[in-house]
C-alpha cells in the first residue's frame, strides 16, 4: 500500500525544527510520499507575517536539499474557507487506495475537539502525533482520551498499511524552535541564522520579512 504523510502548518517561516522533525519521521517510518501542506493564514493577520506566496517560496528553498519532500498547496489554492477535514477529503478522493497520515503536534491533539468536524478526521486519515516524551503525560480532554483509547496503535506497520483510523504517538526529538519565536527575534533584530535553513535566512533578509 502506498503511504502518504501530510505535515500541515503555516510555515511562517519554515525553520530547522520542521526539517529535523520531518527527517526523523522519515528515518523511522519511511513514508512513500511526504507532503508539506502550507495552511491559509487567518484573514486578519499582522502585516509582519509573510504572504502565501512568500511562505511557499521559503518552503521551496528549505526543501531543495531534500527532493523526497514535496509541497502541496491545495489549501492555499482553495477560495473557500480551508478546514482540515475538507483537505483530507480532497486527498482521499485523489488517493483512494493509499494510507493517509496527518502529522500534528501534541498541542494539536489536545485542541482537536475544536477543529471543524473533527470526528470525521480519523475516518479519513491516520494521525501521527509528535512531541517530547514529557508532554505525552499531560491531561487530555475526555473526548480525545476516548479517541486514544479506541484508535491508538504505536505500531508503525499498522500506520503505514491502513487507509485511516490509527493514532500513533511518536517522540521525534526536541527542537526548541518556533516560527512565532523566530518572528519575534527578527523584529528585535536578533540573530536567528542557526534556526533557519541558509537559503530561507537569506530570502528573509532580502525580502525584509518580519520587521
Swiss-Prot record:
InterPro entries: Cyt_trans-like, NadD/NMNAT, Rossmann-like_a/b/a_fold. Pfam families: CTP_transf_like (PF01467). Keywords: ATP-binding, NAD, Nucleotide-binding, Nucleotidyltransferase, Pyridine nucleotide biosynthesis, Transferase. Its EC number is 2.7.7.18. The keyword NAD applies. It catalyses: nicotinate beta-D-ribonucleotide + ATP + H(+) = deamido-NAD(+) + diphosphate. It comes from the Bacteria. SUPFAM superfamilies: Nucleotidylyl transferase. It is an enzyme of class 2 (transferase). Belongs to the NadD family. This is Probable nicotinate-nucleotide adenylyltransferase. The gene is nadD.
